[in-house]
């Protein structure tokens, strides 16, 4: 029996405040709501999903490093670190795990400082502006991607 592919859902700073923080940009769902829906979808796709959120760049980097040879695909919403973190970029490059970058809001329709991502050019894909549904699309992509390389 083959093992289920393992997906890591990583969420960056302030995403623990979803549902309370700026609902016009981020929607009304909490992070727990999103994670629960993602767990349901992962089961449907026969994937094992682990979820992790941190407000600290160090903790996100440590989680990425710990994923080396253990995780098959990463779905990451780096939040504000999208625009500032070369260290997060380097961590993702160091483990060579394919990933999709997700943003709830359309970062290109917001303040100019949010338009640049340090991760987009090394990601398999970028999904932004589709709200919580963007995570679902990322999981579907991860499932399809992993089936192709099996």
Curated annotation (Swiss-Prot):
Binding site for substrate: 77, 83, 90, 104-105, 114
UniProt-listed Enzyme Commission number(s): 4.2.1.10
Annotated site, Transition state stabilizer, chain positions: 21
Top EC category: lyase
Pathway where it operates: Metabolic intermediate biosynthesis; chorismate biosynthesis; chorismate from D-erythrose 4-phosphate and phosphoenolpyruvate: step 3/7
Gene3D superfamilies noted in UniProt: Dehydroquinase, class II (3.40.50.9100)
Encoding gene, per UniProt annotation: aroQ
Source organism of this protein record: Histophilus somni (strain 2336) (Haemophilus somnus)
Record's protein name: 3-dehydroquinate dehydratase
Reactions catalysed according to its record: 3-dehydroquinate = 3-dehydroshikimate + H2O
Active site: 26, 103
Function recorded in the entry: Catalyzes a trans-dehydration via an enolate intermediate.
Alphabetized GO MF terms: 3-dehydroquinate dehydratase activity
Alphabetical list of InterPro entries matching this protein: DHquinase_II, DHquinase_II_CS, DHquinase_II_sf
